[in-house]
Every structure is written in structure tokens, then in C-alpha cells.
UniProtKB/Swiss-Prot annotation:
GO molecular function: ATP binding; single-stranded DNA binding
Organism: Lachnoclostridium phytofermentans (strain ATCC 700394 / DSM 18823 / ISDg)
Alphabetical list of InterPro entries matching this protein: DNA-binding_RecF (IPR001238), DNA-binding_RecF_CS (IPR018078), P-loop_NTPase (IPR027417), RecF/RecN/SMC_N (IPR003395), RecF_2 (IPR042174)
Protein name: DNA replication and repair protein RecF
GO CC field: cytoplasm
Positions contributing to ATP binding: G30, D31, N32, A33, Q34, G35, K36, T37
Gene: recF
Family: Belongs to the RecF family.
Length: 360
């Protein structure tokens, strides 16, 4: 899987842009706030339908414009494909593959597999549970159509149940309807719990070995999947929580409350780890993500590195750069020193200046 070219129109600070990519390492360099990350965002958007920043479509469209376009050519299994994405301020995005519109943008998941790594990925380690759930969901949606289906339906049912909880306080006759939604919530939620548990077990097998290598065998990193409720206990816990749910007008039990813990030698790295340990844990997580995508899809993901090399010491730079050999990588940075110092071969170098891109 490789991205061959990218065209942008009225996307962020780009009025018009056309880029060709090498199947190996591509560098976008320049000062901060020039538009380097916006190019990575466009690729990520085409893979996941979402901005890695969590931005809404209307925020991505260039100021003073009503719509934006992304066109990307990819090669998968030696066959070229064209992907077109049309963003409008007040309408759902439109997507076409090889000129054929798709009904739901979620159908894009799995066509292009990407791994995005930026300094902000420390938030997976440091911030609240929602960041960690987002990581699990984003990765599993790329790897499993079934997970994507169950997640979409779980969120729909959860919203319906929460809306019903707000009405039950005024109309107790709606309790029978609540039971109907509960059965669907249990069905889809149990499937999510099962897949998340299997995913984290696979990640753990990889991350333990990778982190030991990064820490010269001094540390063992383990990810603990903290399901808010066991799959076998979901129905019982939901019943017990009913009165509380009605009082608070929100569902308090289910995979939307799940979390992950990152433990180094048994200690929670979020609470007790140094910034260096947190960075290394984030790097181990991303390296494990790359390996798992390769194992599951039998293909290599596209790696998007957003100014991460400057955040790592030389040893960790080398570990990361060793891992990208043979993988199409698009890197942003402010200078080329890391690549010169590490003698990394680069096929394409572009300089980004205020929304324009020229060969470096």
C-alpha cells in the first residue's frame, strides 16, 4: 500500500497543491505554522474520515471558501485507485473511489491503513480515558469492519438510551422501551469488549518485546485493558445501574467508560513515570501498532511522522528510523539534521513555506 500523489484545493492554508510521493521516505520541512502538518492531516482524513486533531469539516476548509477537495492516488496490491473527498461547511462529506460515490464515508476504513505519530501522542499516556479509547477505536476500525459496524451501532444505541433516560424522569411508562435499548446496547457493547480485549492482548505481545529493546532490558511495559464491565456481567451491571442512570440521565456502564493503563515494571507510567519514560512508552506503542497492522493486513501501513524526531534522543531516533525501512513514510520536520546525522536515505524532500511546497 502506498500513496502515489495528493492534490488539495482550499484545504487549510492550501489554495491549490499537487504532490508526488516516493514509496519510501518523503520529507516535508520548514518553519513551524507553514502547513506541513496539514498535508499529513489530509492523508489521515482519507484513511479514517477523521482529522487527527478532532477538527470538524468546516474548520478544515480554507478561510473565505465554502468547500474543499482532496484527491489522492493510491496503489494497493499493484492496482492504482483514485480517492476523491469533497468537504462542505454545512453538509456531510462526499467520497468517491475510482469515480464511484460511496454511501457512507465510514466505508473508507481499511482501504488505507495509516499510523500517525506526533508529540501529541503523549496525550494517550498522560491525558484522560477518552484519548485512550480513541486510540483503540481508530486502530481497530482500520483493522476490522466488524468492529467498525459494532462501534457505529453501539454509539447510536447509546445516544438513544441517553435521550430516553432524560425522558423517563417525566414518564415512567417508558421503562419498557428502555429494556429494548438495553438488549441492543448489551449486544453491540459485548462485541466491542471482546474485540478490544483481543486487540490489547496482541498489542501486549509486541509492546513488551519492543520496550525491552528500547530500555536495554531494564523496563517491562505492559498495557492493561480496563473494561468498565466484563462481557459476562454487562447485563447484570446495567440492571443494577438503572436507578443511577435515570437519576443522572446518562448511561454509566459500558465500553464507552473503558480505559487503558500503561505499567512500567508494574508502576502506572501516567502517574509515576518521568517524561522520558512516557515518551518511550508512546514510541513503543506506535512501533507495536506498525507491527500489528503488518501482521493483520499482510501489508505495510503508511507512516505519518509529525515532527517527532526532535522530541527523541539519538537512540530512540535510531530505533524509530530503523522501523521505517521498507515502509512508505511521510515526515515533517523543521530541519534535515536528523536525517543527515542518521544517514537516512530520502527519495523526496519538499520545503513548505506559507502554504506553498517546492522541491528541497
Amino acid at each position: 500500500m502506498i500513496v502515489k500523489s495528493l492534490e488539495l484545493s482550499n484545504f487549510r492554508n492550501y489554495e491549490n497543491l499537487s504532490l508526488e510521493f516516493s514509496p519510501s521516505t518523503n520529507i516535508l520541512y520548514g518553519d513551524n505554522a507553514q502547513g506541513k502538518t496539514n498535508i499529513l492531516e489530509a492523508v489521515f482524513l482519507c484513511a479514517t474520515t477523521k482529522s487527527h486533531k478532532g477538527s470538524k469539516d468546516r474548520e478544515i476548509i480554507k478561510l473565505q471558501s465554502e468547500e474543499a477537495h482532496i484527491r489522492m492516488r493510491i496503489n494497493r496490491d499493484d492496482v492504482d485507485h483514485r480517492l476523491d473527498m469533497h468537504l462542505k461547511k454545512n453538509k456531510p462529506k462526499g467520497v468517491a473511489i475510482d469515480g464511484i460515490p460511496i454511501k457512507r464515508s465510514s466505508e473508507l476504513f481499511g482501504i488505507i491503513n495509516v499510523v500517525f505519530f506526533s508529540p501529541e501522542d503523549l496525550s494517550i499516556i498522560k491525558n484522560g480515558p477518552s484519548e485512550r479509547r480513541r486510540f483503540i477505536d481508530m486502530e481497530l476500525c482500520q483493522l476490522s469492519k466488524l468492529y467498525l459496524h459494532n462501534l457505529i451501532n453501539y454509539n447510536k444505541v447509546l445516544n438513544q438510551r441517553n435521550n430516553l433516560l432524560k425522558q423517563i424522569g417525566f414518564n415512567k411508562s417508558l421503562l419498557d422501551t428502555l429494556y429494548v435499548w438495553d438488549q441492543q446496547l448489551i449486544h453491540f457493547g459485548s462485541a466491542l469488549i471482546k474485540e478490544r480485549d483481543a486487540f490489547m492482548k496482541s498489542m501486549n505481545e509486541l509492546i513488551i518485546a519492543l520496550h525491552k529493546k528500547l530500555s536495554d532490558g531494564k523496563e517491562e511495559l505492559e498495557i492493561v485493558y480496563e473494561a468498565s464491565v466484563a462481557e459476562s456481567e454487562f447485563e447484570n451491571k446495567l440492571k443494577k445501574s438503572m436507578e443511577r442512570d435515570i437519576a443522572l440521565k446518562v448511561t454509566n456502564v459500558g465500553p464507552h467508560r473503558d480505559d487503558l493503563s500503561f505499567l512500567i515494571n508494574g508502576q502506572d507510567v501516567r502517574k509515576y513515570g518521568s517524561q522520558g519514560q512516557q515518551r518511550t512508552a508512546a514510541l513503543s506503542l506506535k512501533l507495536a501498532e506498525i507491527e500489528l497492522v503488518k501482521q493483520v493486513t499482510k501489508d505495510k501501513p503508511i507512516l505519518l511522522l509529525d515532527d517527532v524526531l526532535s522530541e527523541l534522543d539519538r537512540k530512540r531516533q535510531n530505533q524509530l528510523l530503523d522501523s521505517i525501512v521498507g515502509i512508505q513514510t511521510i515526515v515533517t520536520c523543521t530541519g534535515l539534521e536528523e536525517f543527515v546525522n542518521n544517514r537516512i536515505e530520502t527519495d523526496r524532500i519538499y520545503k513548505v513555506i506559507q502554504g506553498t511546497v517546492e522541491k528541497g
